[in-house]
Amino acid sequence: MDGPSRTLNVALVGPAGSGKTTLFESLAYIAGAVPRRGRANEGFVVGDPSPEAKARQMTTEVTAAHVVHDDVELTLLDTPGAVELVQEGRNVLPGVDLAIVVVEPVGERMVAAAPFLHLLDALDIPHVVFINKMDRSDQRYRDLLESIRMVSARPVVPHQYAIGRGESLVGYVDLLTEQAYQYQPGKASSAMAVPEDHREREQQARAEMLETLADFDDDLLEAL
């Protein structure tokens, strides 16, 4: 049996408290690398096992998980976000292929992500921004994007658009494929049609994405 077609090293970086380790645990669980998903208040399965990490309920050293997804072998690296520990994460960045910058959905706190974004730019490491805890957010998605743009030296291109119902987050739209997905507790998301009351905003978000891409990547724009 053939092995994975390629391998990638992916680092999760971002401010302390943004939920990197919980996301790290979720990714490992969804990929089938661990039998259950750990949480900060219950103990992590693959996250930092040190006594200090358990006492502080935060990552204090880099931890790794190896998963295979869609014929790609991934080494996921969870890095500390606390200011006094951030050098731990910096030490591994030169060896990664991609970074995921995890942030909270609070515009006023987005400035805490600026040092991570600037460092990734300096090291020329491709990166995406993952807005975590959207189910707890009371801020508009567009306002959050503007907050990210204020601290990023690179153009910010939205990839997914959140779908809300009242105070609940029920799904998202992939702006590349224009396919909507509905969240299913404890299960994979299921495909659904873009809700009528979100169609105009989805089209606006997609147009904004294409307009941004047109400014700096014609080849990618044509592919879409």
Segments the model singles out, each with a brief description of its role:
Residues 1-90, 94-103, 200:
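P-loop NTPase switch module centered on the Walker A-proximal segment
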Residues 1-18, 28, 36-37, 104-224:
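P-loop NTPase catalytic nucleotide-binding module
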